[in-house]
Amino acid sequence: MHVQPPTFGEYAERAKAHGRRMAANQAILADDTVVVCNPNNPTGTLLSPNDVLRMHRDVRNSGGELIVDEAFIDYCPDATVRHHVQDGLTVVGSLTKILCIPGVRLGYICAAPEQIARLQERAVTWSLNVLASAVAAELPRHQAEIAADAQANQARAERFARCLQEMGVRVTAGRVPFLLADFGHDMTKTVQHLRAQHILVRTCDSFGLPTNYLRLAVKTDAENDLLMKVLYRENFDAR
């Protein structure tokens, strides 16, 4: 299996747990299963559908398969390739990210019929609970507000990124509900101080990044301002 860090780490962890050979920061080898997050987590990098399909063609030519994780695609729906699934191209996604209900374990897989059949043979019994099933049934009624929230998130993210950059923080932003922030120094103590104030931020060690990086969720403008105020006090007031 091939993954390219920094990215969501659980694919590599699961592969290692099942004894699969892992490759990262290396050329793609013949017969590799390549996993790419689009948009990427934590960088927010977004590939166009043409880029993804071109990648799929190259991976197939080497005898491999491509898995595209579109967990955050509701924030940039024009980039999805789930309508282009074919042999060797599998798309997985989440139905709860944009609704901010991660505790409802609900997602989907789009793949060629033969791949779906293989996955169904391995699926665990009762993989979908009644709460998740009820949420899935309601989703079609909320497509307009989901689209509106994606647009509003983009405006909040741009404002949040601009304010952090004015503080001297290097920010990587995209069409996602988070920012990757490089503070240039170890943020371990700041994370602890934030937690003591009931503010949680994501450290990035699981993505393969050093402790000067944090992934910051894009919330309301008021909540973003509160976080920036605390970050400034913790990291810049004393300078």
Language-model region placement:
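Short, conserved charged micro-motifs
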Residues: 30, 186-193, 223-226
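PLP-dependent aminotransferase class I/II
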Residues: 88-172
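Active-site phosphate-binding strand-loop segment of PLP-dependent enzymes
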Residues: 16-18, 23-75
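Conserved PLP-binding catalytic core of the aspartate aminotransferase-like
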Residues: 154, 166-197
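Conserved PLP-anchoring active-site segment centered on the Schiff-base-forming lysine
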Residues: 1-14, 21-27
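Short acidic/glycine-enriched loop/turn segments that link adjacent beta-strands
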Residues: 103, 175-176, 208-212
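PLP-dependent enzyme catalytic core of the Aspartate aminotransferase-like
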Residues: 48-50, 196-197, 206-239
